[in-house]
Amino acid sequence: MNLFKEKKIKKIIYINWRFVTLCSIVFLFLVILTLRIIFLQIINSKKLAYEGDRRTLRIQSVINRRGIINDRLGYPLAVAVPVNAVFIDPTMITNKNDIKNNIRWKALSEILSIPLNKLIFFINSDKNIKFIYLARQINPEIGDYIKALKLPGVFLIEESKRYYPTGAIAAQLIGINNIDGEGIEGIEKSFNSYLTGTPGKRKIRKDNQGQIIENESLINKSNSNNLILSIDKKLQTIVYQKLNNAVNENQADFGIAILINIETGEILAMANSPSYNPNNMQYMINKNLRNKAITDIFEPGSTVKPIVIMEALKRGIIKKNSIINTKPYFIKKHKITDVAYHEKLNITGILKKSSNVGVSKIALSMNTSELINSYIKFGLGQPTNLGLIGEQKGFLPKKKKLSDLEKATFSFGYGLMITPLQLARLYTIIGSYGIYRPLSIIKIDHPLYEKRIFPKRYVKNVIHMMETVAHPGEGGSQAAIKGYRVAIKTGTAKKVGIHGYYIKKYIAYTAGIAPASNPKFSLTIIIDNPKGEKYYGGAVSAPVFSKIMKLVLKEMKIKPDNLKNKLS
């Protein structure tokens, strides 16, 4: 009996021990599980959240649609057109061996004009690459077709590309963008940040198929802006077409024309020829990209002579009716002469006949600082601060004292280098009777500010003298416009060759204002290296001045101010 009880007690103890052991194991497991949960959810939660986000969360750039560039009347000069980019994520393409025989992959190859073998090469090129562009700037119709193919690992991105409605007419001024939508030339480059705004960043979540399942937030984004230029599309078209015709007719290397509103300083037209089609860069020539109106510098020739006359009148060195001996003369074995011989000329005659002898003798009566400062006063060799990237400053001599020969040649436009825009500004100041107004490429209602830099009466005197340049039989007569008074100055400058010596190539200038009785517009024409029989400014660029200004005055409804000329 006692033996039986003993065995029973041992059995119970054994069973209890097994139960306790099992419970202990279960309890230990629960403790470990609890600790693991605490570790994962509390202690290591940030790391796990990071790992989860790394697999599903993406930061996607949100690019603003680029702002529109309009002319002063709202006509679009550059617009953003919606397009698509196509890219692949090779890590999401599982059946890589079946691509060659897959009809949908063949369809993608054909629509993008990418050989199928090349497509397969992209997919197999690197196992770690998750982003490979297949095509950029495809039209939305092709994008919809590709989307309908439902190929794994093939995705579309919304983009935009630039379209320029005026084409070549304002190409150098407006500029172009690169494939990523960044301005790389012209106004597109100079105002890039204004046109684009600040790109934002968007947090998105993707599923294991790469599809966006959640947009979380949008940060750091500012909108793009539209830009209204001072340019008038109609006037720009007139200026470009007439300039382009002249460049072709004279077999010139290039031409530049700038039209400015004298009352506000607004640039109404700025044209270069030859130009290019910004909507099709396939046949573009690099040298035609530059806006030579601001990037290139030239010796201005006789177009600076009015400055010398005005300064001499102001200083009392000459009077309106002064007579100057204009016989050729020598300065240290260098002969100063004119195209046509004149024994003597009055001051009007010196400008009318463009006498190097006469203007140089006047300049020799001034000291160096007076002469150079008179050029600086009118903005020569000084930046216009127009806001366009690539503008050159030009060059003026820094010597405290010029030799007589240097002073003489300086008076008729040699020994200094200026941009065409600086020359246009000079004649705009003359047209405003000596008031400087900052130039603007942006539409403005009123001048930014005004500053008188020269007494009105001397400027008006010289304007009257400049009117005679376009009179019948004179060197600038081809710049005349029936019914209107124009005040102009022509010029012809020899070009400097690659070795620093003057060569038998020329630049033909005509710059002036109209109508002369109440100037509204200044116009500057430059024709570089005309290769026909004519190369003088009065023969090459003056006719272009007349053709353009005539149409501008008509378009802007400016009343004729020369009724005698109109009736004759």
Curated annotation (Swiss-Prot):
<dbReference type="GO" id="GO:0008658">
    <property type="term" value="F:penicillin binding"/>
</dbReference>
<dbReference type="GO" id="GO:0009252">
    <property type="term" value="P:peptidoglycan biosynthetic process"/>
</dbReference>
<feature type="active site" description="Acyl-ester intermediate">
    <location>
        <position position="302"/>
    </location>
</feature>
<dbReference type="GO" id="GO:0005886">
    <property type="term" value="C:plasma membrane"/>
</dbReference>
<keyword id="KW-0961">Cell wall biogenesis/degradation</keyword>
<keyword id="KW-0645">Protease</keyword>
<dbReference type="InterPro" id="IPR001460">
    <property type="entry name" value="PCN-bd_Tpept"/>
</dbReference>
<protein>
    <recommendedName>
        <fullName>Peptidoglycan D,D-transpeptidase FtsI</fullName>
        <ecNumber>3.4.16.4</ecNumber>
    </recommendedName>
</protein>
<keyword id="KW-1003">Cell membrane</keyword>
<dbReference type="GO" id="GO:0009002">
    <property type="term" value="F:serine-type D-Ala-D-Ala carboxypeptidase activity"/>
</dbReference>
<keyword id="KW-0133">Cell shape</keyword>
<dbReference type="GO" id="GO:0000917">
    <property type="term" value="P:division septum assembly"/>
</dbReference>
<keyword id="KW-0812">Transmembrane</keyword>
<dbReference type="InterPro" id="IPR012338">
    <property type="entry name" value="Beta-lactam/transpept-like"/>
</dbReference>
<keyword id="KW-0131">Cell cycle</keyword>
<keyword id="KW-0573">Peptidoglycan synthesis</keyword>
<dbReference type="GO" id="GO:0071555">
    <property type="term" value="P:cell wall organization"/>
</dbReference>
<comment type="similarity">
    <text>Belongs to the transpeptidase family. FtsI subfamily.</text>
</comment>
<dbReference type="GO" id="GO:0006508">
    <property type="term" value="P:proteolysis"/>
</dbReference>
<keyword id="KW-0717">Septation</keyword>
<dbReference type="InterPro" id="IPR005311">
    <property type="entry name" value="PBP_dimer"/>
</dbReference>
<keyword id="KW-0378">Hydrolase</keyword>
<dbReference type="InterPro" id="IPR036138">
    <property type="entry name" value="PBP_dimer_sf"/>
</dbReference>
<dbReference type="Pfam" id="PF00905">
    <property type="entry name" value="Transpeptidase"/>
</dbReference>
<keyword id="KW-0121">Carboxypeptidase</keyword>
<dbReference type="GO" id="GO:0008360">
    <property type="term" value="P:regulation of cell shape"/>
</dbReference>
<dbReference type="GO" id="GO:0043093">
    <property type="term" value="P:FtsZ-dependent cytokinesis"/>
</dbReference>
<dbReference type="GO" id="GO:0008955">
    <property type="term" value="F:peptidoglycan glycosyltransferase activity"/>
</dbReference>
<keyword id="KW-0997">Cell inner membrane</keyword>
<comment type="function">
    <text>Catalyzes cross-linking of the peptidoglycan cell wall at the division septum.</text>
</comment>
<dbReference type="Pfam" id="PF03717">
    <property type="entry name" value="PBP_dimer"/>
</dbReference>
<keyword id="KW-0132">Cell division</keyword>
<dbReference type="InterPro" id="IPR037532">
    <property type="entry name" value="FtsI_transpept"/>
</dbReference>
<dbReference type="InterPro" id="IPR050515">
    <property type="entry name" value="Bact_Transpept/Beta-Lactamase"/>
</dbReference>
<feature type="transmembrane region" description="Helical">
    <location>
        <begin position="19"/>
        <end position="39"/>
    </location>
</feature>
<comment type="pathway">
    <text>Cell wall biogenesis; peptidoglycan biosynthesis.</text>
</comment>
<keyword id="KW-0472">Membrane</keyword>
<keyword id="KW-1133">Transmembrane helix</keyword>
